Amino acid sequence: MEKKQGIGFFERYLTIWVALCIVIGIAIGQYLPAIPQTLSKFEYANVSIPVAILIWLMIYPMMLKVDFQSVKNVGKRPKGIVITCMTNWVIKPFTMFGIAYLFFYVIFKSLIPAGLAEEYLAGAVLLGAAPCTAMVFVWSHLTKGDAAYTLVQVAVNDLIILVAFAPIVAFLLGVGGVSIPWDTLILSVVLFVVIPLSAGIVTRIMVIRRKGIDYFNTVFVRKFDNYTVGGLLLTLIILFSFQGETILNNPLHIVLIAVPLVLQTVLIFFVAYGWAKWWKLHHNVAAPAGMIGASNFFELAVAVAISLFGLQSGATLATVVGVLVEVPVMLMLVRIANNTKSWFPEKLS
């Protein structure tokens, strides 16, 4: 009998853990200010070294799970890949920019100062340009998605990130009037995508050669689960120890940032999901296609926001709000996908 799987305890209550990290981080910033002051000294090229290490602990295990050899199967059933790539790279970054600009600069203009609106827009753009990696496997499972095909979708997107993320971010931030140092942006992509991706590929090949694929999937990869959890929690606490003053002065801004992020998530899900219905794809391909577009690679977005704008920036705060809202919104979309399975043909497309 197949072991029942689903969203883990930590992932299910991620919003609660993030809320606790907000409280702990703010408390540290207010009552133990020496801690963030000391951490701020450990920087290189605007990159916080402690945070970089923690983010590697999050991203490296994700890259271990992706079998990039699966990309060779991309031509067998191309429609789902086309939907995923077009949604993630041609539609999503631009709708995120448009929705965020509308809310931060127009609808919430009287509530958000112009300087902060610019930073929040930058954070939203970073989220919109980074499609999800690790959590997609959870959402795919919860919607009874085709696991092998989801793997191909994720692998293709991770490879596209290498070449498309930096130009798209630079272009959209330039349109929004946000100046960014290209060298820092490229360094961020190298640090938080190229290095962990390369390390993941090398590790995967070496371990599978020595121990086999079953050992790798059932034993080796699972050893890193706690590191990922710990890395995320500690990163959030550090971030909020720097962000405490901003949050205490503007508590409503958490909600204001969340509104366009939630709307964008729902919109992109229905764009990809509706496209899959139009092309008559099977539900086990359509649902993961919608989930990949809807969710974000928030670890990468947080890392790049810190590198480009700093730990205390509004851009970093916006990316962290993305972490806060992601799980409850995605669970809602999982429910919608499962309740609309009858929209799709029974036979594989």
Annotate the PLM regions.
Residues M1-L64, Q69-A294, F298-S349:
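Alpha-helical transmembrane segments of multi-pass small-molecule/ion transporters
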